[in-house]
Amino acid sequence: MPMAPSTIADEVERYLRTGETDPHHAAWPGNGFMDRANRAHEDLRGGLVREVRRLAEGLSHEPLPQADTVALTRGKVEPMVRGLFPRVEQDEVLATLEKSVVFLTSANIEALLLEHGYDSSAWTLANLHLASLGADLLGEDAPRLVGLSEETTCYVSPDYFAEDDPFADFIVHEAAHIFHNCKRATVGLRETRTKEWLLDIGYRKRETFAYSCEAYARVLERATSPSERRALAADYGSTVRISEERVDPAEVAGIVAEAAAARNGWKIILARCAPTSRPKSALQHLRDSVAAEEAARRR
């Protein structure tokens, strides 16, 4: 017996519990796809806002200090940018990163949820906000995050200001992800056939890169001498601090130790997390596809 088609209420409930949506929006009426998509957006995001409001009632997050977010962010990411990019490119990259951080608060969460371009990401941001309140999350499998990086924006929890791990810095961690999410042209840098993204980071090494940058940034911030850098790196490696399944904590500790012993540790981190083979540009993928089609026709 065929299953009954999902109703709008079914789709909203599924979205709230899993973050998943029907890309065709089949449950919604409308004159064509765009009409259905607009109706679905209104119902799904409206339901998300109402559920977040319900779960957050009576709760509050860590207060934000009266600080200039741009100045705070620049101070955190500038050493990383200076160490990873040639001098002629540093100002353009810094201009993007210093404006990249958005702290999720009770004041801005609803607007962000309604305006975000992707349903799944809006759901993740909702859970990030709820976690900062100590509230129940939306679903059993909802991620418990303190930060999320998308394109050139880093969403960060107010818990950033309550973090007591001396080697943690969510801003640096999320900013490090921008380097593989953002194309050079986006920040005004010249692209070439082999240089399309800000940095070439191995796909399986992206979290390793971010965790290594995070820890090394804190080592540099705290150390006053080369010997202190090495001692702090050893201290970092003495305790398992990462629970992320995609990352080997021992590998990160080794990278941080090697970086701390080098003149420019940022270059060490980049080299250790580089792709095993140079990634192809979108143009090269297109050329390969055309060549494959032509070869198939000649057979």
Describe each model-derived feature in a short phrase:
Residues 156-171:
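Short pre-active-site segment immediately N-terminal to the catalytic Zn-binding motif
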Residues 174-177, 207-214:
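Histidine-centered, metal-coordinating catalytic motifs and their short helical/loop contexts
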Residues 181-198:
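Flexible internal linker/loop segments at domain or repeat junctions
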